[in-house]
Amino acid sequence: MKKVIRFVYRCLGYLICALHNLFYPVSLKLNPIKEKTVLFVAHQDDDVLFFHTFMKKEKPYVVLVSTGFSLTRMKEFKAAMKHYGLRYNYHCLKSRDERTEKIESIIKKELTRGEFTLCCSHSESGEYGHMMHKNVGKAVKKLSPCRTLSTVDKDKIGGDEYELDEPEIEEKINLFKCIYRSQLFVLDEYKIWVTHEGLTEVKR
């Protein structure tokens, strides 16, 4: 029974995402993207974990590459974007769908939707080696026509220069406790990125 419920739940998540993608171009005609900065994240919670201070400062248009068809995590992502006051879009990919052509297709499409002067995403090595993060980072590097930033990797992020002030750390922790409650394990498992953030210029 649990498997059936889980299957129906995921199908509903896919349907909602697919309908959103179908009608999103219509909303763009009514309300074109004015942001000059675009941020690509692989999954829900990557936004807060890796790009909290960047989002507060730059106010980017945020693109979620993979919803994973999870209604819970989609709801959490929308709540996070509302907290930051950011415009966003999301796409119908499984959380582990690492097909390069699919990822590149999404990124290419989104890059044509605004006149962006700054692009930001994951590093080519996926921060700690996450394959989906890697592929998103590589695709952004390949396709971005403008200045591009990526996350600092695990072997460098622990330095003092990337350590956040205590109020910023507390805010990130509270965002997970209040919004990304399904991902609370992140606070322990990826603690270094809770307390540190860093971006570096992408060299081509």
Q: Where in this protein do the model-derived segments appear?
A:
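Active-site beta-strand->loop->alpha-helix modules in alpha/beta enzyme cores, enriched
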Residues: K2-P145
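The feature marks non-catalytic terminal segments
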Residues: L118, R147-R204
